[in-house]
Amino acid sequence: MKKSVAIVFGGQSSEHEVSLQSARNVINAIDRESYALTLIGVDKLGRWLRFDEADYLLNANDPARIKLSGSGKQLSLLPGSVGGQFVEVESGKPLAAIDVVFPLIHGAFGEDGALQGLLRMLAVPFVGADVLASAACMDKDVTKRLLRDAGIAVAPFMVLNRGESLSFAQAAAQLSLPMFVKPANQGSSVGVSKVSDEAGFAAALALGFEFDHKLLIEQGIVGREVECAVLGNDEAQVSVCGEVVANDEFYAYDTKYLNGDQARIAIPAELPADLSDQVRDVALQAYKVLGCAGLSRVDFFVTEAREIIINEVNTLPGFTSISMYPKLWQATGLSYAELIHRLIVLALERADEARLLKRDIFA
């Protein structure tokens, strides 16, 4: 019997359009012999809408103009309703029971623990990390503190909260130039600036605070940008390493999703075998330290001196046509459809384990 999978996509973050691209690819690749799909789009106002597959997207082939169609039927969510957690508002009818949710909402409200907490309240199994790991990995400040305390190398950094003051001279006294200013809770390089002088610093702070109340100010690292994909729960596996060679100054949003020809992807990365193994080992260490489950992409800088420095850990990496996570697994021998299947199985296994835990001390 087919499992019922709800693909949840869109959302209210600045990565809404990226999410739509990810959803389109997963929907096209999933094994229809094994899974029956329910498509749930979340619009930029936060409304949950059920879509038919025939007309859920407009401008689907244009990453800059892709958007949800106007055909969705609004849903309400009912925690505690066994098998009927999703109800169409207009008809009052519940959707067919959902066995597992595959969340593809990137950024705020999607991979920061908010959606994961909601799905936990709805008692629906879901693909990917749980609440704590999602929240910790979304906040670059928290991620780096946890990794640093575990003895895993990260770039030197400072944190600036809205309302606090920090001059360029103060930052430059602690961090070598160039510096990168990043919103602490954004992904896909949204709001990120490379800074080499005082004027650029002021502009970078202004831009960053448009997207977050907390900024990470990080020392630039001269090194190769290497990424690994991790898959699994307690016994996770790591893919081959890949490398991003950007023609721009850094791997910005436009380069990632709009102008893909501005970067070259090398899979596998052209690293010595022993160094590649070390990178993969550190990826697995970070995955465990942060409590990840299901999947994550771990991004590194690897210097000429063979230093391995973690840049970030993404618990819900992109599944677009140019995204590294599925490409890394394809190069490791796992097809797109099989990867999706493995992720769903991992989600169901984790849910089965959770059901074994006692929640009532008097039962």
Curated annotation (Swiss-Prot):
UniProt-annotated binding residues for Mg(2+) 1: 299, 312
One GO-annotated biological process of the protein: peptidoglycan biosynthetic process
SUPFAM superfamilies: Glutathione synthetase ATP-binding domain-like, PreATP-grasp domain
Binding site for Mg(2+) 2: 312, 314
Catalytic activity: 2 D-alanine + ATP = D-alanyl-D-alanine + ADP + phosphate + H(+)
EC number: 6.3.2.4
Co-factor requirement: Mg(2+); Mn(2+)
Superkingdom of the source species: Bacteria
ATP-grasp domain segment(s): 144-345
Subcellular compartments: Cytoplasm
Keywords of the record: ATP-binding, Cell shape, Cell wall biogenesis/degradation, Cytoplasm, Ligase, Magnesium, Manganese, Metal-binding, Nucleotide-binding, Peptidoglycan synthesis
CC terms in the record's Gene Ontology section: cytosol
Record note on cofactor: Binds 2 magnesium or manganese ions per subunit.
Keyword Membrane: no
InterPro entries: ATP-grasp, ATP_grasp_subdomain_1, D-Ala_lig_Van_CS, D_ala_D_ala, Dala_Dala_lig_C, Dala_Dala_lig_N, PreATP-grasp_dom_sf
Residue sites binding ATP per the record: 172-227
Single annotated GO MF: D-alanine-D-alanine ligase activity
Family the entry assigns: Belongs to the D-alanine--D-alanine ligase family.
Function: Cell wall formation.
HAMAP family noted in UniProt: Dala_Dala_lig
Listed name of the protein: D-alanine--D-alanine ligase A
The organism's taxonomic lineage, starting at the top: Bacteria, Pseudomonadati, Pseudomonadota, Gammaproteobacteria, Pseudomonadales
